């Protein structure tokens, strides 16, 4: 939830895809994720829209799809319903314990990187620095609150879920009906880019490429 659109730097799609990147925006006071997504959706124009979101961005693009017509939704390292949240987050929602979570540690970049991508990147901290520019404390507190309290019960139609089997943020044991990548962590968009470059176009077959618009949302 702290990453920017540079997480898509290694993704290379055919020229007939018209790609637009959606950068994060600061939420308005007391704005829900539904209201936030409605505001973002007004910036999206075109036909045959495919929304792609990573992690918290995967939740946001699902909310955006409730306001605009989409051809397909692709989420990566994310969740489709509240039931796919890990047990600790589900307990946090019930007890409100997450409100005690202090995000002051974001000033320590290493702690932030380990939280977002998992301990597997410990030896590559500096390589990930450019991807984690969203470090506003108010924003992170808001996103944690919206994530833990997301209440979606049923996934949208025409959704494709791609997930790493070794994801520690959203453990695969809680994930239903997804394409699982062996050895994949929460950072598969970076570490499995060759797989995405080969397989994403296959996921977008039967689209009129004259009108296609891909909206790539960062890990908001």
Where are these regions (language model features)?
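Gly/Ala-rich beta-loop-alpha elbow adjacent to hydrolase catalytic centers
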Residues: 52-61
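Conserved HGGG/HGGXW glycine-rich cap/lid loop of the alpha/beta-hydrolase fold
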Residues: 1-28
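Flexible "cap/lid" loop of the alpha/beta hydrolase fold
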Residues: 69-102, 213
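Short beta-strand/loop motif that positions the catalytic acidic residue
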Residues: 161-163, 167
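Short glycine-rich catalytic loops that host catalytic nucleophiles or stabilize transition states
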Residues: 22-24, 174, 179-184, 190-192
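Catalytic histidine-centered segment of alpha/beta-hydrolase-like enzymes
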Residues: 30-31, 184-199, 214-219
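Conserved alpha/beta-hydrolase catalytic His-Asp/Glu region
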Residues: 105-151
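Conserved acidic catalytic loop of the alpha/beta-hydrolase fold
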Residues: 18-20, 34-49
């Amino acid at each position: 939830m702290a990453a920017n659109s540079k997480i898509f730097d290694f993704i290379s799609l055919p020229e007939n895809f018209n790609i637009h990147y959606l950068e994060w925006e600061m939420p308005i006071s007391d704005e829900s994720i539904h209201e936030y997504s409605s505001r973002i959706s007004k910036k999206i124009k075109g036909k045959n829209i495919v929304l792609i979101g990573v992690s918290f961005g995967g939740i946001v693009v699902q909310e955006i799809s409730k306001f605009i017509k989409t051809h397909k939704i692709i989420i990566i390292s994310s969740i489709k319903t509240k039931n796919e949240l890990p047990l600790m987050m589900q307990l946090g929602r019930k007890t409100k314990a997450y409100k005690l979570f202090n995000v002051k540690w974001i000033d320590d970049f290493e702690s932030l990187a380990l939280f977002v991508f998992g301990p597997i990147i410990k030896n590559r901290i500096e390589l990930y620095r450019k991807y984690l520019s969203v470090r506003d404390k108010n924003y992170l507190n808001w996103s944690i609150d919206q994530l833990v309290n997301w209440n979606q019960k049923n996934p949208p139609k025409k959704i494709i879920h791609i997930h790493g089997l070794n994801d520690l943020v959203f453990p695969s044991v809680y994930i239903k009906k997804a394409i699982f990548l062996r050895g994949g962590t929460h950072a598969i968009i970076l570490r499995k880019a060759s797989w995405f470059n080969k397989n994403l176009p296959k996921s977008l077959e039967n689209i009129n490429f004259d009108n296609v618009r891909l909206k790539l949302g960062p890990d908001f």
